[in-house]
UniProtKB/Swiss-Prot annotation:
It holds the Pfam family Ribosomal_60s. HAMAP family: Ribosomal_L12_arch. Residues 86-113 are annotated as: Disordered. It comes from Arabidopsis thaliana (Mouse-ear cress). The gene is RPP1C. Keywords: Phosphoprotein, Ribonucleoprotein, Ribosomal protein. InterPro entries: P1/P2_N_sf, Ribosomal_P1/P2. It comes from the Eukaryota. This is Large ribosomal subunit protein P1y. GO terms for molecular function: structural constituent of ribosome.
Length: 113
C-alpha cells in the first residue's frame, strides 16, 4: 500500500518531468512542501535517485503494460508447435459461425399464469 509520502513524491516527479525541469531531491521536497504535505525526509532522495536511473516518461507510458505469466506462455506456444497455434483460431471461427441456441423459451411454466 502506498503512503502519502510516496504519492506526493510521485506527483512531484511527474510535474517536474512534464515541465522539463531536472529532477532533484531539493526540487521534489520544495514541490511537496508547497503542496502542504508533510513527508519523511528520505522520500525525495529516493525518488530523485530513481529518476536518475530511469526515464520517467517511459515509466509513465508503460503503466499497466506489464503482464503476468500469460504473455510468455502465449509466446512459447507458436515456438513449440506452429500447427497447434493455427488450429486454435480456426476453432474460434467455427464457434462464431454456429447460431446461438435458443433459450428454453416458454415451456408453459409461467410465473403469472
Amino acid at each position: 500500500m502506498s503512503t502519502v509520502g510516496e504519492l506526493a513524491c510521485s506527483y512531484a516527479v511527474m510535474i517536474l518531468e512534464d515541465e522539463g525541469i531536472a529532477i532533484t531531491a531539493d526540487k521534489i521536497a520544495t514541490l511537496v512542501k508547497a503542496a502542504g504535505v508533510t513527508i519523511e525526509s528520505y522520500w525525495p532522495m529516493l525518488f530523485a535517485k530513481m529518476a536518475e536511473k530511469r526515464n520517467v516518461t517511459d515509466l509513465i507510458m508503460n503503466v499497466g503494460a506489464g503482464g503476468g505469466g500469460g504473455a510468455p506462455v502465449a509466446a512459447a506456444a507458436p515456438a513449440a508447435g506452429g500447427g497447434a497455434a493455427a488450429a486454435a483460431p480456426a476453432a474460434e471461427e467455427k464457434k462464431k459461425d454456429e447460431p446461438a441456441e435458443e433459450s428454453d423459451g416458454d415451456l408453459g411454466f409461467g410465473l403469472f399464469d
